[in-house]
Curated annotation (Swiss-Prot):
This is S-adenosylmethionine synthase 1. Pfam families: S-AdoMet_synt_C (PF02773), S-AdoMet_synt_M (PF02772), S-AdoMet_synt_N (PF00438). PANTHER family: S-ADENOSYLMETHIONINE SYNTHETASE. GO terms for molecular function: ATP binding; metal ion binding; methionine adenosyltransferase activity. Belongs to the AdoMet synthase family. L-methionine binds at E31, Q74, D221, K252. PROSITE patterns: ADOMET_SYNTHASE_1, ADOMET_SYNTHASE_2.
């Protein structure tokens, strides 16, 4: 939310904003350089309230918790090395840090995402929906989902066969029984989300297997930015360079690097070059050009991977400043990056997710 608020007023904002929470406390800290006038405490309270943390008994009281804000400007050393204090042309802007980013795509779902991750993410979204619309009034904001899918490996491509296990652990109020929880989750969450063709008599459902989950949210567990980076990406498929996305403006290399390689991997699969692909990007701080770009199609490529890599390099501009322009990443004002903070950054049908737009890749079909 802080990223959106800054970009709405100043598209050149540089935001590296971290958040941590524990009982009755939210702390926001980091480095932000912006011309925007932002009330960070108001943002924190509104965000917590919108999530559903409206009283101490659900884990946090948005209106009465302590909010600590410690924001400084971006280091001038970083600023001069990366964007020259805003004097460099877009094609000259260097990476803001070292690191490697991965993009992944697979033809097992229409979203070109892993089915196990798509289902787990949709279950989480459905939990929020039935809590907020009152279908399951006993639900509270905290919860986790996990889906285990049985696959067939078709010469490197992953073909889903069935759902082996569905796991949902969700916070609840004191009044509901475990049997009621299980029945409601099956009827109102699992059935609307998981296609019947993937469920059978052997599918296992672990629904609140610990037996009790009343204490949750920041009261139950401390929270910190960047602790759930696999949920943000591909659910354990592909690979991850370790850098979190949330709280960072889109010029940060972890974020825009991951976005451009997702577009590249998705375009490889959507163009029929392969059924499954991973693209890796390697960066050095202050350097515009990537140190390396790597493509692996897991043996599913219609042409050799080295030829696919050549097509990718000819099609995509991996320089940081050009990524921001080509993906229109600096546009703010509509809660665009807030939407990425829950239910994943990839595989979403939303015009704001510009990195999900497929770029046609031209190649000679045999």
């Amino acid at each position: 939310v802080a990223v959106d608020a800054c970009l709405e007023q100043d598209s050149d904002s540089k935001v590296a904003c971290e958040t941590c929470t524990k009982t009755n406390l939210v702390m926001v800290f980091g480095e932000i350089t912006t011309k925007a006038n932002v009330d960070y405490e108001k943002i924190v309270r509104n965000t917590c309230r919108n999530i559903g943390f409206v009283s101490a008994d659900v884990g946090l009281d948005a209106d009465n918790c302590k909010v600590l804000v410690n924001i400084e400007q971006q280091s001038p050393d970083i600023a001069q090395g990366v964007h020259g204090h805003f004097t460099k042309k877009p094609e000259e802007i260097g990476a803001g840090d070292q690191g490697h980013m991965f993009g992944y795509a697979t033809d097992e779902t229409p979203e070109l995402m892993p089915l196990s991750h798509v289902l787990a993410t949709k279950l989480g979204a459905r939990l929020t929906e039935v809590r907020k619309n009152g279908t399951c009034a006993w639900l509270r904001p905290d919860g986790n989902t996990q889906v285990t899918v049985e696959y067939y490996n078709d010469k490197g491509a992953m073909v889903p066969i069935r759902v082996h296990t569905v796991l949902i652990s969700t916070q609840h109020d004191e009044t509901v029984t475990n049997d009621e929880i299980a029945a409601d989750l099956k009827e109102h969450v699992i059935k609307p989300v998981i296609p019947e063709k993937y469920l059978d008599s052997k599918t296992i459902c672990h629904l609140n297997p610990s037996g009790r989950f009343v204490i949750g949210g920041p009261h139950g567990d401390a929270g910190l930015t960047g602790r759930k980076i696999i949920i943000d990406t591909y659910g354990g498929w592909g690979a991850h360079g370790g850098g979190a996305f949330s709280g960072k403006d889109p010029t940060k290399v972890d974020r825009r690097g991951a976005y451009i390689v997702r577009q590249a991997a998705k375009s490889i699969v959507a163009s029929g070059l392969a059924r499954r692909a991973i693209v890796q990007l390697l960066r050095a701080i202050g350097v515009p050009e990537p140190l390396s770009v790597f493509v692996d199609t897991y043996g599913t490529g219609k042409i050799p991977d080295r030829e696919i890599l050549k097509i990718v390099k000819e099609t995509f501009d991996f320089r940081p400043g050009m990524i921001s322009i080509n993906l229109d990443l600096l546009r703010g004002g509509n809660g665009r990056f807030l939407k990425t903070a829950a239910y994943g950054h990839f595989g979403r049908e939303d015009p704001d997710f510009t990195w999900e737009v497929v770029k046609p890749l031209k190649w000679e079909k045999a």
